[in-house]
Amino acid sequence: MTLAPTFIARGLLAALMLIASPWANALVFAVNEGVTYRVPLEEVRGRYAAIAADLSKILKQPVTVEPVGDYNLLRRGLASKSYDLAMIHPAHVSIQAIKGSGYKLVAITKGYQKYTASFLVQPDSKLNSLADLKGLKLGAPDEDSITSWMVRATLRDAKLDPAQMSITYTRYQDAVPFFVENNLTQAGATAANALVKAWQTKGGKILAQSKPVPIKHILASPNLSADQIEKVREYLIGLDASDEGKKKLEPTKYTGFEKYDEAKMLELGAWLGL
């Protein structure tokens, strides 16, 4: 069957309109909320809708929110520069993108500047320092979580080789105290403040803590101009300065954003082993 010329012309016109549409050149704002948190991806999309709408106006280009739950998928997107903007929970993935793909640190999230891993032990534990963990079992969150990257760096600071230790990794941080309580491990590491407080309330001890590391970073692709990046930074940092901005922040559950020295971030990357 031969297609009518009019039908073909309409098809070509539709294709040309799609190419010319601003949505064909939409900027992608990837959002990752961490590997150990149970947040549905569609819920993540809704949380950032108002901010994405503002960014569309500021950059004069549509901005679409793309939730990314898997770290390896996130890494691939950053490596290929598929994401123009990215909200990244784990510091190690951010640092890898800055070092390897030329991304720029735009801002970090207030309230998450000093993310710290705590090593939990039983109230009657005879352990006095991290060095005492040699030859013992340690519970920790997902192996690729920022918490576990921090845990391994802290163990190295204590002259312990993580590769030669018995570390039991678990998908969720709230399983770590269970390991210690039930003597499945002699210590457990978590960076969840609620878990640490609950542990101490029950009489549990904190054996040691890691260096603090800021998490939940906003990065910008090298495909964006310096002017565009600065506009995004000014917008994000100024969000909590007005009632309207605070309202837009509410769905994200964050209080605001602030600047952070990219060089300091890279120094932390060296400590993490990147």
Question: Can you name each region flagged by the protein language model?
Answer:
Residues 19-24:
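N-terminal signal peptide c-region/cleavage motif recognized by signal peptidases
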Residues 27-94:
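Extracytoplasmic small-molecule ligand-binding "clamshell" domains
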Residues 31-35, 111-121, 200-236, 240, ...:
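Periplasmic-binding protein-like
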Residues 37-54, 91, 115-178, 182, ...:
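Bilobed "Venus flytrap"/periplasmic-binding protein-like clamshell domains
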Residues 65-76, 165-178, 213-214:
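Short helix-initiation/N-cap motifs at beta->coil->alpha
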Residues 68-132:
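Acidic, polar ligand-binding/catalytic clefts
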Residues 90-100, 152-153, 157, 178-209:
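A ligand-binding cleft/hinge motif common to bilobed small-molecule-binding domains
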